[in-house]
């Protein structure tokens, strides 16, 4: 399993707008592509000083599945123009990690 991690930052004034864009358009668009090997996506958010940081964590079966999503140079960040319009800055490249262990909680 491969975890693809990416960070983007925006202003507090644009944070809710960006979150809605992710959840209502961008994530839906990714799901609608029906990429074989795409397992899901998480969205994290926190305030950092005068900015709001967002982190996306995508899970894929393999690097081949990541390439189906991002292209041959799979580390390049996939940032739609609508997102660029509300972000103040963002990672140009995503980080990829092998998921080596995963455990559930008590709940």
PLM regions with names:
Residues 16-18, 51, 66-68, 104-106:
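Short acidic, gly/pro-rich beta-turn/loop elements at beta-sheet edges
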Residues 3-9, 40-74:
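Short, well-ordered beta-strand segments in beta-rich or mixed alpha/beta enzyme
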Residues 14-40, 77-82:
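Short amphipathic alpha-helical segments
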Residues 12, 60-62, 98-101:
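Non-catalytic surface loops within mature trypsin-like serine protease
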Residues 20-21, 43, 58, 86:
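Acidic/proline-rich low-complexity IDRs
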Residues 39-52, 78-107:
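Glycine-rich beta-strand-turn "strand-cap" elements at beta-sheet edges
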Residues 29-34, 65-69, 80-85, 93-94:
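Glycine-rich loops and low-complexity Gly/Arg-rich segments
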């Amino acid at each position: 399993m491969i975890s693809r991690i990416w960070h983007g930052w925006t202003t507090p004034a644009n944070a809710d707008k960006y979150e809605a864009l992710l959840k209502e358009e961008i994530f839906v668009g990714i799901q609608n592509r029906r990429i074989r090997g795409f397992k899901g996506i998480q969205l994290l958010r926190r305030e950092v000083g005068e900015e709001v940081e967002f982190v996306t964590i995508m899970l894929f079966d393999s690097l081949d599945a990541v390439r189906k999503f991002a292209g041959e140079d799979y580390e390049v960040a996939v940032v739609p123009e609508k997102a660029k319009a509300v972000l103040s800055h963002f990672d140009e490249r995503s980080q990829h990690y092998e998921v080596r262990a995963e455990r559930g909680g008590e709940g």
